[in-house]
Amino acid sequence: MNRIDLKKLIIPNIPYLLFVWLFDKAAQAFRLSPGADLSGKLLSLGTGFSAAFSNAAPSLHPMDLLIGIAGAVLIRLIVYFKGKNAKKYRRGMEYGSARWGNAEDIKPYVDPVFENNVILTQTERLMMSSRPKQPKYARNKNILVIGGSGSGKTRFFVKPNLMQMHSSYVVTDPKGTVLVECGKLLQRGGYKIKVLNTINFKKSMHYNPFAYLRSEKDILKLVNTIIANTKGDGEKSGEDFWVKSERLFYCALIGYIWYEAPEDEKNFTTLLEMINASEAREDDPDFQSPVDLMFERLEEKDPEHFAVRQYKKFLLSAGKTRSSILISCGARLAPFDIRELRELLETDEMELDTLGDRKTALFVIISDTDDTFNFVVSILYTQLFNLLCDKADDVYGGRLPVHVRCLLDEFANIGQIPKFEKLIATIRSREISASIILQSQSQLKAIYKDNADTIVGNCDTTLFLGGKEKTTLKEMSELLGKETIDSLNTSETRGRELSHGLNYQKLGKQLMSEDEIAVMDGGKCILQLRGVRPFFSDKYDITKHPKYKYLSDYDKKNAFDIERYMKRRPAIVKPEEPFDCYEISEADLQEDKP
């Protein structure tokens, strides 16, 4: 460490040895000049310089050396104080250095192979690899897409990225149009297609959240998701005490089902039946409902059972209080009274934990006008993120073999995913990414409150497709920064004589002001990538994509029929499930011919 400090001290001062030599020779010249006094020596100074510089070696006379060193020190002090008090000029950047990015700025972030990129604009792309040759160019694939209604969020972002087919995809599909338009293409590419349709249950595959419970902490996550995305309509359902009591009750019932129920009864139908069988009487504290008796028998068998411990805490409340809690629970799960929804959630065909194993496309179709069943979608996404993270850590050493991209269109309508601000910060390393698609940033703040900024901060890329919401316009304008411009002022003075004046000065101006962003051309977009100048580019022309001809946009014959696909898909057989296997020879086929 001392050696390094010594180098820093000596090396910058080496040039000042020249001044030691110059002042030394000047002192020698003055000393060698003939003359009895100062004026005489000055008059014959030329003779002294000739004598002094006849030999290039420095004078070793003590006075000459002292003057040489003193002169060099004086020069060093002048340079030091001049540097300390120097004016810091940034010519042309007095008020800011913002500018639009160009092809050279984005070049290090683009993979030469077109298919290995995330499509952002017509001219900008982002490589899928999270480990480029130079680590400083690594960026996460979390993208915040903002665009008002009709700005082309689906056409200019979702569909072009589906056509890249380099990952597994989870797509929120309002109205179900993306599945129809892109399903055939994905099927041709060897993708397994999964569909959860909360608009038309007949066109949906089954999804059973109980099939993905692996531990007691998964039970807690499921209960928290249900409570966060549903409302109990009881008188006191919004108060903290009542919500905590409901949580205990749900944990007890779901814990009982997960541990004790037969495999075909591990679903929400059983949960509803248990809630319906629960009862509390204010006037009879000794009354026991069928559910009370079930837990009593379970306690006799295993007093430390998770479900028993939760239920005993629930029973600490008085009979009247428990009645209110049961009413709130019934109101919260009222949507499950619909038979089609119960049937949808009885069995499971989604195989959520396999999305990172092989290329799969999961389409989550939600209504853009009715959020009644959106809590089911919240449960699915919560389980999906947790399942994939756990599998990446436990099976694949921290990274999934197939990247999973979540294109979360109409993100505000999905509902609240518990701890999403923490999930989005950690999924990157597991080869999972989320594209959050919103109409305005205020939608995110309405759901996630103070955590909205954390979520935005974990998206290295922001793509603005257009809009007029004031908060979004203000934040986009501030994000772009200020540029320095030249201003010319002219003045005219009228009096006895007419005089004119010109004044040039520098001013700071937003690279794009709020009103300019609001009236931005419909074919343009603004892209901001972390660590790079912003881009003002054309939106991606979907018709120029090599695979566009396989979409139903190009040819109606390419429309995907989900009902036909569901009828023809092979049955899902679990590893532990017994089944019969028949071998058919060519001779058997010949015998069957007429």
Put a short name on every predicted segment.
Residues 1-151, 155-158, 202, 482, ...:
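Basic- and hydrophobic-enriched, low-structure N-terminal and domain-boundary segments
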Residues 126-132, 231-241, 486-505:
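Low-complexity, polar-biased intrinsically disordered regions enriched in Pro/Ser/Thr/Gly
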Residues 424-526:
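Conserved ATP-driven motor cores of ASCE-family P-loop NTPases powering translocation/secretion/packaging/pilus
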Residues 52-55, 65-117, 216-226, 274-277, ...:
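Short alpha-helical interface patches
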Residues 107-108, 114, 375, 411, ...:
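A short glycine-/small-residue-rich loop at the edge of a beta-strand within enzyme catalytic domains
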Residues 114-120, 375-383, 476:
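Conserved long hydrophobic alpha-helices within structured protein cores
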